[in-house]
Swiss-Prot record:
Belongs to the dullard family. Keywords: Endoplasmic reticulum, Hydrolase, Membrane, Nucleus, Protein phosphatase, Transmembrane, Transmembrane helix. This is CTD nuclear envelope phosphatase 1B. The keyword NAD does not apply. GO terms for biological process: head development; nuclear envelope organization; positive regulation of triglyceride biosynthetic process. Residues 58-225 form the FCP1 homology domain. It is found in: Endoplasmic reticulum membrane; Nucleus membrane. InterPro entries: Dullard_phosphatase, FCP1_dom, HAD-like_sf, HAD_sf, TIM50.
Amino acid sequence: MLKTRQCLLGVRTFHGVTSRIWSFFLYILRKHIRTIIQYQTVRYDILSLSPISRNRLNNVKRKILVLDLDETLIHSHHDGVLRPTVRPGTPPDFILKVVIDKHPVRFFVHKRPHVDFFLEVVSQWYELVVFTASMEIYGSAVADKLDNNKAILKRRYYRQHCTLDSGSYIKDLSVVHDDLSSVVILDNSPGAYRSHPDNAIPIKSWFSDPSDTALLNLLPMLDALRFPADVRSVLSRNLHQHRLW
């Protein structure tokens, strides 16, 4: 009887150890699969400007690209979420620990595919500005991680800079710059930029799809938007797209 119990205990211990090893293996595999997918996708080649294009850029103002965070560049969920939108077992890119209302909260943050490459490229074309409806203590920490000491996300606006209207946070781009002809906002929420639809580029909300290429797909358009004197002359033709998201 004693030997039988010892045998059962040994089997259970072996099963427990095997299960933990398998879970760790899946964790590492999923993390590396995301990296492999990003580097296998075709990148956007940055070509040298012709003399004519360079002269054109010298005759227009440098544009400002305003970037939303949640569901545009990243997705996060925090402790206590019963049904997170991320597939269980998917490792976060980083974890933030912040104190909200005197309570410590952990946020598990997932970066949208290609966001690092996207920021590296567009920072060469635009002055980048973060504008999020999130609280500053959270938004600032996320922006720090995305910036990664490159000093490309220095200007930041948070919930206190938004206007609350019927329960929605509206982003007033005039706080970013008084000349809206040179301001572009990239945001997954049309309600956030409803005061400035002619300055907006819509993007689908992202939660967990590892094959998403939305940020890469926007690079040709953002490349071209550097050249017109007024970005609204181009983006106003795209208003029908805002209803899709």
